[in-house]
Protein backbone atom coordinates (compact mmCIF):
# COMPACT_ATOMS: atom_id res chain seq x y z
CA UNK A 1 0.00 0.00 0.00
CA UNK A 2 1.45 3.39 -1.04
CA UNK A 3 1.46 6.08 1.63
CA UNK A 4 0.07 9.47 0.68
CA UNK A 5 0.11 12.43 3.02
CA UNK A 6 -2.79 14.85 2.78
CA UNK A 7 -1.52 18.29 3.78
CA UNK A 8 -4.39 19.18 6.10
CA UNK A 9 -5.50 18.97 9.70
CA UNK A 10 -9.16 19.37 8.66
CA UNK A 11 -10.87 16.13 9.68
CA UNK A 12 -13.70 16.64 7.17
CA UNK A 13 -11.27 16.85 4.27
CA UNK A 14 -9.31 13.85 5.57
CA UNK A 15 -12.50 11.74 5.70
CA UNK A 16 -13.29 12.65 2.08
CA UNK A 17 -9.78 11.80 0.86
CA UNK A 18 -9.78 8.50 2.75
CA UNK A 19 -13.16 7.55 1.30
CA UNK A 20 -11.90 8.24 -2.21
CA UNK A 21 -8.29 6.95 -2.01
CA UNK A 22 -8.24 4.01 0.41
CA UNK A 23 -10.43 1.79 -1.82
CA UNK A 24 -7.80 2.36 -4.53
CA UNK A 25 -5.05 0.97 -2.30
CA UNK A 26 -3.56 4.11 -0.78
CA UNK A 27 -2.65 4.52 2.89
CA UNK A 28 -3.89 8.05 3.59
CA UNK A 29 -2.27 10.05 6.40
CA UNK A 30 -3.14 13.54 7.60
CA UNK A 31 -0.72 16.06 9.08
CA UNK A 32 -2.01 15.10 12.52
CA UNK A 33 -1.34 11.41 11.78
CA UNK A 34 2.33 12.18 11.10
CA UNK A 35 2.64 14.56 14.05
CA UNK A 36 3.08 17.72 11.96
CA UNK A 37 1.74 20.65 13.95
CA UNK A 38 3.18 23.92 12.54
CA UNK A 39 0.79 26.12 10.58
CA UNK A 40 1.72 26.56 6.93
CA UNK A 41 1.27 30.17 5.91
CA UNK A 42 -1.02 30.36 2.89
CA UNK A 43 0.35 33.41 1.13
CA UNK A 44 -0.96 32.61 -2.36
CA UNK A 45 -3.52 34.72 -4.17
CA UNK A 46 -5.25 31.69 -5.70
CA UNK A 47 -6.39 28.27 -4.54
CA UNK A 48 -3.75 26.72 -6.82
CA UNK A 49 -0.88 28.78 -5.36
CA UNK A 50 -1.88 27.85 -1.79
CA UNK A 51 -2.16 24.15 -2.65
CA UNK A 52 1.35 24.19 -4.16
CA UNK A 53 2.81 25.98 -1.11
CA UNK A 54 1.36 23.35 1.22
CA UNK A 55 2.30 20.31 -0.91
CA UNK A 56 5.89 21.42 -1.47
CA UNK A 57 6.44 22.41 2.17
CA UNK A 58 5.31 19.04 3.54
CA UNK A 59 6.99 16.97 0.82
CA UNK A 60 10.30 18.76 1.39
CA UNK A 61 10.09 18.05 5.13
CA UNK A 62 8.96 14.41 4.86
CA UNK A 63 10.36 13.16 1.55
CA UNK A 64 6.94 11.60 0.86
CA UNK A 65 4.20 11.93 -1.74
CA UNK A 66 1.94 14.78 -0.65
CA UNK A 67 -1.43 15.95 -1.89
CA UNK A 68 -2.53 19.41 -0.80
CA UNK A 69 -5.96 20.86 -1.23
CA UNK A 70 -6.94 24.48 -1.18
CA UNK A 71 -10.59 24.99 -1.71
CA UNK A 72 -13.35 27.37 -0.94
CA UNK A 73 -16.54 29.06 -1.91
CA UNK A 74 -16.89 31.77 -4.54
CA UNK A 75 -20.17 33.73 -4.52
CA UNK A 76 -20.88 35.75 -7.66
CA UNK A 77 -22.90 38.48 -5.90
CA UNK A 78 -19.92 39.05 -3.58
CA UNK A 79 -17.40 39.35 -6.42
CA UNK A 80 -16.01 35.86 -5.81
CA UNK A 81 -15.70 36.19 -2.04
CA UNK A 82 -15.01 34.55 0.31
CA UNK A 83 -12.62 32.80 -2.14
CA UNK A 84 -9.17 31.97 -0.74
CA UNK A 85 -10.32 33.44 2.59
CA UNK A 86 -13.20 30.95 2.94
CA UNK A 87 -11.89 29.31 6.13
CA UNK A 88 -11.13 32.67 7.76
CA UNK A 89 -14.01 34.70 6.32
CA UNK A 90 -15.31 35.83 9.71
CA UNK A 91 -11.83 36.31 11.21
CA UNK A 92 -8.47 34.63 11.72
CA UNK A 93 -9.98 31.96 13.98
CA UNK A 94 -11.33 29.29 11.65
CA UNK A 95 -14.98 29.05 12.70
CA UNK A 96 -17.52 27.41 10.38
CA UNK A 97 -20.57 28.80 12.17
CA UNK A 98 -19.24 32.38 12.23
CA UNK A 99 -18.36 32.10 8.53
CA UNK A 100 -21.89 30.89 7.68
CA UNK A 101 -23.50 33.69 9.68
CA UNK A 102 -21.36 36.34 8.00
CA UNK A 103 -22.11 34.96 4.52
CA UNK A 104 -25.87 34.76 5.12
CA UNK A 105 -25.91 38.29 6.59
CA UNK A 106 -24.16 39.64 3.47
CA UNK A 107 -26.73 37.93 1.25
CA UNK A 108 -29.83 39.01 3.22
CA UNK A 109 -32.57 40.11 0.82
CA UNK A 110 -30.71 38.87 -2.28
CA UNK A 111 -32.93 36.80 -4.63
CA UNK A 112 -32.06 33.15 -5.34
CA UNK A 113 -31.01 33.77 -8.94
CA UNK A 114 -28.46 36.30 -7.68
CA UNK A 115 -27.06 33.89 -5.04
CA UNK A 116 -25.16 31.75 -7.54
CA UNK A 117 -21.93 30.27 -6.25
CA UNK A 118 -19.43 27.51 -6.76
CA UNK A 119 -17.22 25.39 -4.61
CA UNK A 120 -13.73 25.32 -6.11
CA UNK A 121 -10.90 22.94 -5.29
CA UNK A 122 -7.28 23.04 -6.39
CA UNK A 123 -5.20 19.96 -5.68
CA UNK A 124 -1.42 19.91 -5.89
CA UNK A 125 0.57 16.68 -5.88
CA UNK A 126 4.21 16.78 -4.96
CA UNK A 127 6.15 13.60 -5.70
CA UNK A 128 9.78 13.79 -4.53
CA UNK A 129 12.09 14.34 -7.50
CA UNK A 130 9.27 15.46 -9.82
CA UNK A 131 7.67 18.77 -10.70
CA UNK A 132 4.60 19.65 -8.63
CA UNK A 133 1.40 19.31 -10.66
CA UNK A 134 -2.05 20.81 -10.07
CA UNK A 135 -5.64 20.12 -11.09
CA UNK A 136 -8.91 21.87 -10.34
CA UNK A 137 -12.52 20.89 -9.82
CA UNK A 138 -15.70 22.83 -9.19
CA UNK A 139 -19.39 22.35 -8.53
CA UNK A 140 -22.07 24.96 -9.24
CA UNK A 141 -24.94 25.91 -6.98
CA UNK A 142 -26.69 28.59 -4.97
CA UNK A 143 -26.50 29.87 -1.41
CA UNK A 144 -29.62 29.08 0.63
CA UNK A 145 -31.23 31.56 3.02
CA UNK A 146 -30.59 29.30 6.01
CA UNK A 147 -28.50 26.20 6.79
CA UNK A 148 -29.96 22.81 5.84
CA UNK A 149 -28.58 19.37 6.66
CA UNK A 150 -26.11 17.94 9.14
CA UNK A 151 -23.58 16.12 6.96
CA UNK A 152 -20.37 17.67 5.70
CA UNK A 153 -18.57 20.71 7.06
CA UNK A 154 -17.77 24.32 6.25
CA UNK A 155 -20.27 25.93 3.89
CA UNK A 156 -21.97 22.61 2.99
CA UNK A 157 -25.22 23.45 4.88
CA UNK A 158 -25.85 26.59 2.79
CA UNK A 159 -24.65 25.34 -0.62
CA UNK A 160 -27.63 24.16 -2.70
CA UNK A 161 -26.29 21.95 -5.47
CA UNK A 162 -27.42 23.04 -8.95
CA UNK A 163 -30.07 20.71 -10.42
CA UNK A 164 -30.72 19.15 -7.00
CA UNK A 165 -33.02 20.25 -4.21
CA UNK A 166 -30.41 19.42 -1.59
CA UNK A 167 -27.53 21.20 0.03
CA UNK A 168 -24.16 19.48 0.24
CA UNK A 169 -24.94 18.84 3.92
CA UNK A 170 -28.16 17.00 2.99
CA UNK A 171 -26.33 14.56 0.71
CA UNK A 172 -24.90 11.31 2.02
CA UNK A 173 -21.11 11.06 2.07
CA UNK A 174 -21.29 8.71 -0.90
CA UNK A 175 -23.41 11.13 -2.94
CA UNK A 176 -21.22 14.09 -2.06
CA UNK A 177 -18.05 12.17 -2.93
CA UNK A 178 -19.43 11.57 -6.44
CA UNK A 179 -20.26 15.19 -7.30
CA UNK A 180 -18.13 17.46 -5.11
CA UNK A 181 -15.47 19.87 -6.30
CA UNK A 182 -12.89 17.75 -4.46
CA UNK A 183 -14.12 14.55 -6.12
CA UNK A 184 -13.89 16.15 -9.56
CA UNK A 185 -10.34 17.36 -8.89
CA UNK A 186 -9.34 14.00 -7.42
CA UNK A 187 -10.56 12.17 -10.53
CA UNK A 188 -8.25 14.38 -12.58
CA UNK A 189 -5.41 13.79 -10.11
CA UNK A 190 -5.79 9.99 -10.15
CA UNK A 191 -3.69 9.47 -13.27
CA UNK A 192 -0.86 11.55 -11.78
CA UNK A 193 -1.04 9.65 -8.50
CA UNK A 194 -0.93 6.30 -10.26
CA UNK A 195 2.37 7.34 -11.91
CA UNK A 196 3.98 7.92 -8.50
From Swiss-Prot:
Protein origin, superkingdom: Bacteria
Binding locations of substrate: 8-13, 71, 153-156, 176, 181-182
Record carries keyword Magnesium: yes
Cofactor: Mg(2+)
GO biological process: nucleotide metabolic process; purine nucleoside triphosphate catabolic process
Keyword Magnesium: yes
SUPFAM superfamilies the record matches: ITPase-like
Active site, per annotation: 70 (proton acceptor)
Enzyme Commission number(s) from the entry: 3.6.1.66
Bound cofactor: record note: Binds 1 Mg(2+) ion per subunit.
Keywords, sorted A to Z: Hydrolase, Magnesium, Metal-binding, Nucleotide metabolism, Nucleotide-binding
Catalyzed reactions per annotation: XTP + H2O = XMP + diphosphate + H(+); dITP + H2O = dIMP + diphosphate + H(+); ITP + H2O = IMP + diphosphate + H(+)
GO cellular component: cytosol
Binding site for Mg(2+): 41, 70
GO molecular function, one term: nucleotide binding
Gene3D superfamilies membership: 3.90.950.10
Quaternary state and interactors: Homodimer.
Function field: Pyrophosphatase that catalyzes the hydrolysis of nucleoside triphosphates to their monophosphate derivatives, with a high preference for the non-canonical purine nucleotides XTP (xanthosine triphosphate), dITP (deoxyinosine triphosphate) and ITP. Seems to function as a house-cleaning enzyme that removes non-canonical purine nucleotides from the nucleotide pool, thus preventing their incorporation into DNA/RNA and avoiding chromosomal lesions.
Family as reported in the entry's similarity comment: Belongs to the HAM1 NTPase family.
Protein name as catalogued: dITP/XTP pyrophosphatase
Organism name: Bacillus licheniformis (strain ATCC 14580 / DSM 13 / JCM 2505 / CCUG 7422 / NBRC 12200 / NCIMB 9375 / NCTC 10341 / NRRL NRS-1264 / Gibson 46)
